[in-house]
Design a protein with these regions (language model features):
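Non-heme di-metal
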Residues: 1-299
Length: 299
């Protein structure tokens, strides 16, 4: 089915002046505080998101169909032929690998980013909130696993060498970090969009489970959409050109490392969707509560 295009929205790659980008950082910072509330540094949490998670946990939804043992054998690394797994198990093993990749990156970046109270520049405050939002997403992912009866899923210890590599990446000059960081957010958004579309076919036989996973997913997706705009705002004209060139190799490298991906998604089409990303294709349920750069909105 073709995406529904809505007027008034433009490409994420739309040009922006330096002044527009400065104004949009101010706008985004206000949006973050309004949506997230107070940052809880020690807990790597945000007050409003903490309340939202508590509401989910107070209204428990659990599947009536236990996840097979093949999940436990394959969720960290694929041991079996992925074609032998049913689609629900395949989705869950992919989701774990995807989320753990995120967790490793944000855990290393957190140690390199100053707390809000010590941040000198606005972009440092924005980045700290951004990382706290990502940690909140990890809790929502865990809630998804609990919905499927997988209460013991954890992300495991952070490999020392991996932490060092991610930490070194976080210390690079902003102009070097901005394009790959932007593409990473764009890649995440395309994954969430595809997951949202496939829920009916995979868990439609349990409407309460389907609806709960969709609620959790869209809470993450709303932030991810705002992160795409935020990361776009870090880039000048050269950064935008570099980001466009990085989409293809980054998509290939990431999805090529997860065997489940090619069985669940049309990753080639996802890459094309990212290269042509347009806010007009986002559902109003997500778009209306997220944040969009002003230069990506047509008058």
């Amino acid at each position: 089915m073709a995406s529904i295009r809505r007027p008034g929205r433009a490409s994420i790659f739309s040009p922006a002046t330096e002044r527009e980008r400065e104004e949009n950082f101010e706008s985004y910072w206000l949006y973050q505080q309004r949506r997230d509330g107070e940052i809880l540094e020690d807990a790597k949490d945000l007050s409003e998101k903490q309340k939202n998670l508590a509401r989910f946990r107070a209204d428990t939804v659990r599947t009536r169909w236990p996840v097979p043992d093949t999940f436990h054998r394959n969720y960290i690394a694929m041991q079996d032929d992925p074609r032998s797994l049913d689609r629900r198990t395949l989705l869950l093993t992919f989701l774990y690998k995807f989320a753990r990749h995120e967790w490793i990156g944000i855990s290393a970046a957190w140690d390199e980013c100053p707390p809000v109270a010590r941040a000198v520049h606005l972009i440092d405050k924005i980045s700290r909130y951004h990382l706290a939002e990502e940690f909140c997403h990890m809790r929502l992912f865990q809630e998804m696993f609990r919905t499927f009866g997988l209460d013991g899923v954890e992300w495991g210890p952070l490999p020392k060498r991996t932490k060092q590599l991610y930490g070194a990446f976080a210390r690079l000059p902003g102009a070097l970090v901005a394009p790959p960081a932007f593409v990473s957010e764009l890649m995440g958004l395309t994954v969430y969009q595809q997951l949202d579309k496939m829920l009916e076919s995979i868990v439609g036989d349990e409407p309460d489970v389907r609806d709960r996973i969709r609620e959790l997913l869209r809470a993450i997706m709303t932030d991810e959409l705002s992160h795409v705009g935020e990361r776009r705002n870090f880039m000048g004209p050269l950064g935008v050109r570099v980001a466009k060139l990085m989409v293809r190799p980054m998509f290939r490298a990431f999805f090529g490392g997860i065997p489940e991906a090619r069985l669940l998604f049309d990753t080639r089409q996802m890459r094309k969707d990212a290269e042509a990303f347009d806010y007009s294709t986002i559902s109003p349920e997500v778009l209306d509560v997220s944040w969009t750069p002003s230069y990506c909105m047509r008058p």
